Amino acid sequence: MSSIKGPAAAPAKFDGSALRIAIVHSRWNKTVIDALVSGTIATLKAQGVKESNIVVESVPGSFELPLACSKVISGSHVQAGASATDLLGGLTFGTSTPTTSFTSPRPVSRSSTPAPGGSGPVLANMPSQPFDAVIAIGVLIKGATMHFEYISESVSHALMRVQLDTGVPVIFGVLTALTDEQALERAGIGSGSDKGHNHGEDWGLAAVEMASNSRRWAEGKFQA
C-alpha cells in the first residue's frame, strides 16, 4: 500500500527566475547535510532560480539557525539598499580628489589605483534585491539525553518567529530523526534497497512557491 504522506502538487507552476533565495545550514551530521543541501539547490535551479541568486551560508549547529536566518534576511536588505560607493567604502578610483578617513584626519587618496578597464569601479553581480525566502537546514538525531528534545523545540519555535517577525518565508528544513538511518533515508541516501526521499527537494519547491506567493499577496493579488 502506498503512503498517503507528502504534499499535494502545487496548484500552479512557479517561475523562480526573479527570486533570490538563501540557504542556511548547520554542519552537524555532515553526510546528511551535504545531500540535503545538494537536493535543495538542484530543485531551486530546476524551478528557474539563477545560480547567482542562491546564497549558501553555514553555522555550527541547528541551535544557531534562527539567529543566522534573521541576520541573513536583514543583511540582504542592507545589500539591496547599498550603492556602489557604499560597498566600496567611499573609495575613489582614477581621480585626484582625496577622501577623508573617519578614523584619521589625514586625507586618503587612491588616485594611483587604476580602475578596472580604466573607466571606473566595476562591481560584478552586485545584489539588487533582498532574499525572497530562506531555507534553514539542519539534522538532529536523538541521543541518550534530553538534548534532542530541547534543541528541536527551541529551533522550531524560533524559526517560526523569524518568518513572522520579518515577513520573509523561512522554510523548515530541520530533520528530527530518532535514528541515523531515519536521517539518511530522508536525505535519499538510506543504506537499504530503498534509499528514501531527499527532503531537500521538497524544501526547494516550498521556497519558490512561498516566495512567489508572498510577493503576490504583498501586492494585494489573490487567486479568484
Regions from the language model: what does each represent?
Residues 11-64:
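Glycine-rich phosphate/diphosphate-binding loop of Rossmann-like nucleotide-binding domains
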Residues 66-80:
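Charged, often glycine-rich, active-site loop that binds/positions anionic groups
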Residues 76-129:
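Intrinsically disordered, low-complexity domain-flanking/linker segments in eukaryotic proteins
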